[in-house]
Amino acid sequence: DSLDRIVGENVQFIWQTGKFYDEDAKKVMAEKKPGNVVQTAFVSNMDEAYRAADLVVSRAGASSISELQLLGKASILVPSPNVAEDHQTKNALALVNRQAAMMVSDKDAPQKLIETVLTLLSDSDKLKTISDNVKGMALNNAVEKIVDRVFEIIERKK
C-alpha cells in the first residue's frame, strides 16, 4: 500500500483528493494516521502549496503544466486516461522529452508512483535539472506576446 510506504519517510505530502475521493481518503487517513501526510479535498491556496513543494505530482492538463513551467517546479506527471485523444500524455511527453518532468502512467501509478517520488526526491541533481528545464520552457508574458502578434497581423492587413 502506497500510504504504508511513505509513513516514516522524511518527506511531507499534501494530498489533494478531489471531492469524489474525499470521504474514502479520510477513512484511510483515520486508519493509517500518517503524520507526514496532509489530506484535503481541495487546496484553496495553491500558490502556497506550490511554494512549499520541492516536487509536484499532477495530472498533465495544459493549465497545470503552464503553472509548473512558470514556477519552475519539478514534477511527476500522471496523465489522465479519460481525456480526448489522450492529449494529457502528449502534454506530458512534451516535457519528459526535454527532461523537464517525469511521467508515470495512470495504470502504473499504484505500483510505481511513490517509489518514483522517493527516488526523485533523493536525487537533488536530477530534481534541479528538471526544475531548470521546465522553467526554461515557460512562456513568460504570453498575453503581451499574443496581443503584439494580433497587432502585427492587423497592421499587415491595412
Please annotate each region the language model reported:
Residues 1-55, 88-92, 97, 104-113:
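Donor-nucleotide binding loops and adjacent catalytic segments primarily
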Residues 18, 61, 79:
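Short glycine-/small-residue-rich Rossmann-like dinucleotide-binding loops
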Residues 47, 65-73, 93:
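Short alpha-helical segment that forms part of, or immediately flanks, the ligand-binding pocket
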Residues 51-64, 73:
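Acidic donor-binding loop of glycosyltransferase active sites
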Residues 58, 74-85:
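Short hydrophobic beta-strand element within catalytic cores of glycosyltransferases
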Residues 102-108, 120-124:
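Conserved acidic donor-binding segment of nucleotide-sugar-dependent glycosyltransferases
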Residues 126-140:
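A short, well-ordered alpha-helix in the C-terminal region of glycosyltransferases
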Residues 139-158:
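C-terminal alpha-helical cap of glycosyltransferases
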